Amino acid sequence: MQRARPALWAAALIALALLRGPPAARAGSGAAGTGPVVRCEPCDARALAQCAPPPAAPPCAELVREPGCGCCLTCALREGQACGVYTERCGAGLRCQPPPGEPRPLQALLDGRGICANASAAGRLRAYLLPAPPAPGNGSESEEDRSVDSMENQALPSTHRVPDSKLHSVHTKMDVIKKGHAKDSQRYKVDYESQSTDTQNFSSESKRETEYGPCRREMEDTLNHLKFLNMLSPRGIHIPNCDKKGFYKKKQCRPSKGRKRGFCWCVDKYGQPLPGFDVKGKGDVHCYSMESK
């Protein structure tokens, strides 16, 4: 029996490793940590009996377990080979990493544009997503202006110490008027920048809705939801397989879950199942002739 490509839990584990830090642990591994825990069904004799024979040794240098909660063995990817959420695992001592300098590392892994590289460099993954710390001593313009205003306010009474001096009185009034104009200008600048920022945020949200397809929006909503979970259920989460434009790829899969074998089906670009394909069907489903590029 042909096995279905196990896509779901590889996506969940990689997404959590990137977004939360520590990798997800299997329930029976006994690994301690604060990361989320994935509870997989046991790989007993009944589950292993449903696996196809492992690949022969010459074409397969190393055997590894299926991604996620799968129980069967498959060929491991070698160093330098392309990898991602929907591919097989990298070999021992290797980890799937986004290309160096990739501006969107998580999307690169979802698109299968990662590279199997030495695991000692895997700690760099989080650096792609962590925002740069603010430079020390960087204050806002309004804080600097307030400091200047405070210094000017402290110096202002000195102009009143000269008795019966009309010249100093005129200068004092001029200074007060100038300061008032400066504060009004700063207040207008802050209000204008705030309105401009709100307009840009609204425009970016509108642009996201129009540019990203339904599959991409579902995937991002699911990954955002995973940030707040401390425990994952293999039955409760589905991460779709999206193309580069954010629409659904023709082939969607559910992974193996211990005793329960995975399955695949074909959909259109909006995620609707195509007629003639049984969603619960077993074995491999060939949608490649219709695969969107």
Swiss-Prot record:
InterPro entries: Growth_fac_rcpt_cys_sf (IPR009030), IGFBP-3 (IPR012211), IGFBP-like (IPR000867), IGFBP_1-6_chordata (IPR022321), Insulin_GF-bd_Cys-rich_CS (IPR017891), Thyroglobulin_1 (IPR000716), Thyroglobulin_1_sf (IPR036857). This is Insulin-like growth factor-binding protein 3. Residues 132-166, 178-213 are annotated as: Disordered. Residues 193-204 have a biased composition (Polar residues). Residues 1-27 form the signal peptide. Residues 178-192 have a biased composition (Basic and acidic residues). Residues 36-119 form the IGFBP N-terminal domain.
